[in-house]
Regions:
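Active-site and NAD+-binding cores of ADP-ribose-processing enzymes
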Residues: 1-62, 87-206
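A short, exposed loop/beta-hairpin motif centered on an aromatic-Gly-Thr core
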Residues: 67-73
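Short His-Asn-centered micro-motif
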Residues: 73-75, 83, 155-156
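Alpha-helix initiation and capping sites
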Residues: 74-79, 133
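Short active-site loop/helix that positions an aromatic residue
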Residues: 77-91
Length: 206
């Protein structure tokens, strides 16, 4: 059975031509995020606290303030909904005052492509996209340590199989001053989009 091992020492990781994915500055990125509660981060900033339970948090444990940042984005609304509400498979439009936000990065993002051959060449497997979160975070820490100037990771959602982005510290300067769109999930227009996404993946809408 294919397993995801712990990563080697960061200096053992290698890059070859074609291992990086480029996300152009005209690409629309989506994020579904809380605006109330603990450890809330505004839409255009990285989270410098962690690691949380999220798959690719690059911060060293134990959880706490860090000089390494992270933020997650998808290329479609359905993947945002699937990922954020996966525990209960129900979309709560009130708890945490969630917002749906879209923006275009201010420059091209250069990301390590975890959907190609890089994982297997470096001792991992495609499970780095879908495996146990603690092991994926160990790989994220090793990658971030090896290439601190890398903007982050290009990977696929374990829920939908669609592309996702984990942005690391170097990508912190790529948020524009204003979003293309940012509305609460309770907004009638946003609720319609989210309801359609929830129906598509079989989630309830609260």
């Amino acid at each position: 059975m294919v397993k995801l091992p712990l990563p080697p020492a960061p200096e053992a990781l290698t890059l070859e031509e074609g291992d990086l994915a480029a996300v152009a500055e005209h690409t629309v990125l989506w994020r579904l995020h809380r605006t109330a509660g603990e450890n809330v981060v505004v839409w255009n900033a990285l989270r410098y606290w962690g690691p949380s339970h999220a798959r690719f948090d690059p911060q060293q444990p134990p959880p706490g303030p860090s000089d390494r940042g992270v933020s997650y984005a998808a290329l479609d609304i359905t993947t945002c909904v699937a990922e954020v509400f996966q525990d209960r498979r129900a979309v709560d439009t009130a708890r945490g005052a969630p917002y749906l936000t879209a923006w275009r990065p201010s420059r091209t993002l250069h990301l390590l492509d975890l959907t190609g051959t890089w994982p297997i060449r470096n001792g991992a497997s495609h499970l780095i996209n879908t495996g146990p979160h603690d092991l994926c975070r160990a790989w994220a820490r090793a990658i971030d340590s090896r290439w601190p100037d890398l903007d982050g990771l290009w990977h696929v959602s374990a829920m939908t199989g669609e592309p996702e982005i984990a942005m690391f510290t170097a990508a912190g300067d790529t948020f524009p001053p204003r979003p293309l769109f940012s509305r609460p999930l309770s907004d009638p227009g946003t609720r319609g989009w989210v309801a359609a996404a929830a129906e598509r993946i079989g989630y309830d809408l609260i």
